[in-house]
Amino acid sequence: MQEQYTPSEIEAKVQQHWQDTKTFEVTEDENKEKFYCLSMFPYPSGRLHMGHVRNYTIGDVVSRYQRLQGKNVLQPIGWDSFGLPAENAAIKNNTAPAPWTYENIDYMKNQLKMLGFGYDWSREIATCTPEYYRWEQWFFTKLYEKGLVYKKTSSVNWCPNDETVLANEQVIDGCCWRCDTTVEQKEIPQWFIKITEYAEELLNDIDTLEEWPEQVKTMQRNWIGRSEGIEMTFQVAGSDQSFDIYTTRPDTVMGVTYVAIAAGHPLAEQAAINNPALVEFIEECKNADTTEAAMAAMEKKGVATGLNAIHPITGKEVPIWVGNFVLMNYGTGAVMSVPAHDQRDYEFAKKYGLNIEAVIKPVDGEVDISEEAYTEKGVLFNSAEFDGLDFQAAFDAIDAKLTAEGKGKRQVNFRLRDWGVSRQRYWGAPIPMVTLADGTVMPTPEDQLPVILPEDVVMDGIQSPIKSDKEWAKTTINGQEAFRETDTFDTFMESSWYYARYCSPHADEMLDPAKANYWLPVDQYIGGIEHACMHLLYFRFFHKLLRDTGLVNSNEPAKRLLTQGMVLADAYYYNNEKGARVWVAPSDVTVQETDDKGRTVKAVDSEGHELVYTGMSKMSKSKNNGIDPQEMVDKYGADTVRLFMMFAAPPELTLEWQESSVEGAHRFIKRLWKTAHDHIANGTTAELDVKSLNAAQKELRRELHKTIAKVGDDIERRQMFNTAIASIMELMNRLQKAPSETDQDKALMQEALNAVIRLLYPIIPHTCFVLWNELGNQGAIEEVLWPEVDESALVEDSKLIIVQVNGKLRAKITVAADASKEEVEAAGMAEEGVVKHTEDKTVRKVIYVPGKLLNIVAN
């Protein structure tokens, strides 16, 4: 065995072996327990970042561990390869998105192989290929036939100068990223999938996800947002018009003093006909940012319509206002306003001088609304026949009254909206719908699928090539002229079912049900918590759609979910002559002074700029603080990078990148290598005879088997990989100090190293692959099983007993593990420190905690 640890040489050799033997290619085997481990597939942006490396290292550790459990393990990989970044890069580099994407895939594929991830590359998919999106298009037509797809107008970001739709990220401070024109909101027809039809099931089935993080489940419950309330009808005074309002607080209905409607509400448009101020306000609302964060932060404004609504219970008239905080596409586009019991309504009423009438008070006191709204539930007053009722009693009574009079009904609502899947972009899967010359809209016939996206295009940076090319849209259906849909799918469509396609990636059908039902559901899914409410919800929804189409037989796509934390690194900047921040890469920074806790006080870059240190923040291009995985692998080897990633922090917490810690991981592997080298150089190893071991050898073997048990539990049940590694490191420290003179010393070291190498194999597989054979074991390490715990080794021959007199420590004694209470008591009483503190006293009681403590009570 070579003395020096040379990762580049070792890793290249081992990776070539895996490739030549197709080690990680798997097929269905009914005689083996399956395990499907999946990490969220990457977008091929050009290079892997450390966030990818962390995600995929966790997945690989889990996969390799399960393989050593004797399971049939599937760990596939692919590329989430449609999306806007490819269009932007194509425009910038004067190319088309396709070649840019495929070049990135090739480069990143080599990076993944360089890191030693055990993927079944025979199942590789790229979502931008017709072989993949063909079946997505087919499935969409089936959903349309089932009535789960529809088209309606919806608001988009519109650049009037370029006459094109903009994605949210292309709107910078309300202006077009390209020409700086003020962006407008425009209503255009778009396709939707009825996820709301599954809202109740998606919500209820969260309770079955026992091995998903509570945080993700809570976020999904809130996103789905089930509420129970009453939908009530308000008449418009002086007309036969009416409109509906939904509220979850019907107990406050007697305190309604005005009604607020959305700028897009029919009543708002009607009232604006002779009201220039309202016209201007409606335009302002239409062009406002309607994201939740923006809505929460913006100033609440309104304009009176001049119309009044008739209260459905009291018959009083209340004014109707247009408010910028009401959205047409949420609820009914109208809200009842009770300023005494809603803080937003309170502030709005104060601002515009509207009435505030309290109708709820605490059970045991008076209500004070002089400074703010009283928003708690309490008892009703100033509410006519409902006075004195609590929330639930008032809810029921008001519901009964409105229902009897035909003015309202109890209703369950969801915050969740139907999934808009239309994107006015080029680089996506074409939506397989056509419009005939007579205006009939229909799905593309199956024999015309896939609708192929042309890849040889010129990007002008303004309009999608399939929108500007009028010929592409033309087609013929049953001899009739027809026009293809020129919108493409939201890229969440591709990522919602890729996990299932891996089960039969080359099938001439969407899924091979037999293969899908062998592998699914995914046993372990790994990805960032930022995907909790979008991808992970669509992922669950799509699985139910696949189930209801007869393609899978399970209810949920993944049994267990691990959400890994972000990777952080130091961030530094200086202000240039224009006052703008220039972020400097950590590799270009020299730290000149630190405080007593090691924190940076003074730092400069290579050009002498004095830098501001902002602390640790997420690795990103914007802060120029990313660390290139390639550089780290070239410098230390893939196994070192993997070990650091798994050891530096628990997987769900943020990981702070410290190169000094990477160096520490590298030293540990070199120490392991040296320990194995020295053991092999020490000569032939005899058979281990556990019956002839001395006390020190038994203790070392006990530590070995305790470590095996702990590491297995840490990896499988607790998923605390960092503590598993810490246990192995502690054991290695003991092994390095262990004697190696006798045959049984050497035999015990052989057993220990064989076990340690298998424990570490999922984490540092290249090193362990080589060491396994160097230690004289036959065959590849992938073909062996996880070390078994020898329960007999855990049995201790002796126990250390703490001896106290009146609760104070007076001695420590070692007794046989099976010693009786009487024997322990006799040994304890004979100790000098015990004799000294009991000789002039009467022993009143002796308390013995078996194997731990002897307490003598004397006075």
From Swiss-Prot:
At which positions is motif 'KMSKS' region?
Answer: 618-622
UniProt-listed GO biological process terms: leucyl-tRNA aminoacylation
Output the superkingdom of the source species.
Bacteria
**Subcellular locations according to the entry:** Cytoplasm
* Catalytic activity field: tRNA(Leu) + L-leucine + ATP = L-leucyl-tRNA(Leu) + AMP + diphosphate
Q: Which UniProt keywords apply?
A: Aminoacyl-tRNA synthetase, ATP-binding, Cytoplasm, Ligase, Nucleotide-binding, Protein biosynthesis
> Listed GO cellular component terms?
cytosol
UniProt cross-references to CDD domains, sorted A to Z: Anticodon_Ia_Leu_BEm (cd07958), LeuRS_core (cd00812)
Q: Which molecular-function annotation in GO is an example for this chain?
A: ATP binding
Q: Name one Pfam family in it.
A: tRNA-synt_1
Record motif 'HIGH' region, residues:
42-52
Q: Which NCBIfam families match?
A: leuS_bact (TIGR00396)
HAMAP family per the UniProt record, alphabetical: Leu_tRNA_synth_B (MF_00049_B)
The record's similarity note reads:
Belongs to the class-I aminoacyl-tRNA synthetase family.
Name it.
Leucine--tRNA ligase
The encoding gene is: leuS
